[in-house]
Structure formats: C-alpha cells, structure tokens
C-alpha cells in the first residue's frame, strides 16, 4: 500500500470538525485546525462549493426561485450566506 493510502486508511476521513485524541480541533485526514492555513485559491474553491450547496437548498425551498431575476437570486444567496 502506498504511503498516501496508508495514512488515509489509518487516519480515516472526517468531513466535519472533531476533537482528536490530543483534544485538538481536527478535520479531514487528521489535520489540526490550529496548524491549517488556506491560500486564497483554496478559500475560493471552498466558497464556490458552499454557494453551490446553498443555492441547491434555496431552490428546493422556494418554488419561485427558478423564475426570479438574477439580481434577486444574488441578493437572496448573499443574505443566506451572511446569516449562516
């Protein structure tokens, strides 16, 4: 088994933040959050994915979504994003 696969196998993947055995906030394949840094490209990629997910949820919730004008959609998405 290649090194990458071994580490992935033994660490396991978690998509949500959790506390590791050392009580550190951790995510992914054992990445301690306190040690993480994001460059702008990665942050933008994450933002785009979050916006896609958010727009899908909004579309399922509001029947008028498909017929709304783009500016209305943009305001609704931004408001939902800002409110969390």
Predicted regions and their residues:
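Acidic, aromatic-lined catalytic clefts of primarily extracellular/periplasmic carbohydrate-active enzymes
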Residues: 1-83
């Amino acid at each position: 088994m290649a090194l990458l696969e071994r580490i992935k196998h033994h660490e396991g993947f978690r998509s949500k933040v959790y506390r590791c055995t050392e009580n550190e906030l951790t995510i992914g394949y054992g990445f301690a959050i306190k040690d993480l840094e994001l460059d702008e490209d990665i942050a933008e990629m994450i933002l785009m994915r979050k916006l896609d997910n958010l727009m899908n949820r909004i579309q399922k919730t509001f029947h008028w979504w498909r017929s709304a004008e783009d500016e209305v959609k943009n305001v609704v998405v931004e408001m939902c994003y800002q409110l969390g």
